[in-house]
Amino acid sequence: MKKLILMSITSALAMLVSAGTLDREPGIKILNERMTLLPYVALSYTYDTNVDCTKAAKSGSQWVINPGMELKYEDDNWLVDAVAWYKYHAYNNYSSQLNSSSFGERLKWQWTNASNGGRGWTILFSEQFEQIAQDDNLSSLGGRGMNRDRKQFQAEGVISRRINQWWHGALRSDYYLLDYDNNVSEYAWLYGWSRLQLGLEGGCTLSRWTDLIISANYQWYWHDDDFDNHQDMEDIYGSRRGRYVRGDSKGWSVMGGIATHMTEKLSYRLLAGWSHFEYGGGVSNLDGWTYQGSADWQIDAANTFHVMAIASSYYQPSEREFGSALLVHNASFGIAKSFVKNKLKAAADVAFRRETHEYTEYEADNYNENIWTARLTLSYRINRLLTVYGRVEYQTEESDGYYVRGNIYDYDRWRATIGLRMTW
């Protein structure tokens, strides 16, 4: 029932750790080699010291079979990247409460008539769906959501325009949905939520490497309250505030900063500003500084050494308490390196997530959770088809506050995985 952390950096590192190029690129090429199909299947074994992420620390292990298909298409103006996958989890023990299946898909579509950063339009659409098993790894949709069987969906559309060599702008919209598969006979209820966001960004190019950026976003949130006794009513009565507490929330943020390409290999983006979150149907408000930052450094000319860092803060509805809020701070750092003509690849990342729980009805119950995660992954490309890989993960949580007296949410968790992947 605990949170798995991860961050956007995981996806990038996973790509670096995946099978590399040996004699020739894997995949089935069609349409004059503009489209590549990459069918694959992977078999892995995982030992987990703490399946539930609790102080009780019950261990378990499982075999996972993971077939999937990747599709890539690219020409002068178009880019399509799609993945569909399925996982069957065969638990050796501790299986009565765990989902045996997980599956998902991801699609990215992009069109542009701007070349080399010149004047023109770019249209981007992406979406992703995942039905996630409780013991999922740390890469699922940025690690959002507690360690429980759940569905996640997100979609984003962006239209950007570079007007001339100095000015550019973008309009974006995105939707996110988190839906828990609650089973009250086994676990306490968790509250899913959804968000619709609209954003506008403008920039001015000061030099070849530096842009000034200003962005504004507005969000609408909806809390899932199916479990409560008031499930047929719109509102519940807030005992502390003497007002109705509802599941709808809204917020906005305004940020400014710089986006810089120091070289073709080194770039970063730093934004900071102010955010407002009105939750519980307007019963409570939160205001504070907010930030977003990312950095990417391709160190060597051969593209074998990669460093990334990401940090952000944001508000969201609580997943433990209806009509309450959560302030999240995320930070992560990762490196990836290739050896032996790209046959051997190594990646390491560390992440920190701080969650401040703000309760609507009883402020004395507010508490904090600090979650650290570290991971090391190695992969070796045996030949064009086969890759063997191994991964070690460690996660720990510390909590403080009146609600968690006795540190009831604290835990430590180790996971070790070894697997074999075949890509045609």
State the predicted function of each range.
Residues M1-K29:
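Cleavable N-terminal export/targeting peptides
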